[in-house]
């Protein structure tokens, strides 16, 4: 997949919603900084307040160990989903990853629920027919190698378009207006994955799927394939910036 010719997006203000320190935007943040985007990060799990989404041109919603349904124990999720719903239904571009795609689905009225088994591993996803004609996913290979590390899944929101799927989980990526969500990770470095292996919720899903002795080989495999996956992630994210975020800014102005 070829990246678009990079250009400055210095007029763009992006809001990054982060749910745990070890799940930053990774290569997506690299792209934002390279393109001159002004980045405002909110570490929601640390109690940082949510700003007014109207002050931003795009939102990036990252992953985390919590469920999109944990409203009782994490009441800030209610406000976050309200922000996402208002922003997306108003046409603001959004990019959601793992928990981020689940929060996007929930904010659009879809059900988020535990899957039959955690999906953990370096696993392929297939671009759908709609994905092959999508402005962001059209130039992607038909099959992508991705890092999967999740236990919950979601129903496709009404009005959304499925862009990618896998044998285990039908909904791997979707588009709703200018909002895109992906269940998988393409932003992660080997170092980030090693940090994830210290998070209790992630350790549990890792043990259930790969066994107690499976972690070292899994982390070594991520280390080996991280650069290739990050290049794919970079290309998709740049396509979203250039074909969704930038045109939306031109329309808004």
What do the PLM-derived regions correspond to, one by one?
Residues 26, 74, 128-135, 199:
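Serine-centered coil/turn micro-motif
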Residues 61-131:
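Cysteine-nucleophile active-site neighborhood
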Residues 186-222:
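C-terminal helical/coil "lid" or tail adjacent to the Rossmann-like core of SAM-dependent
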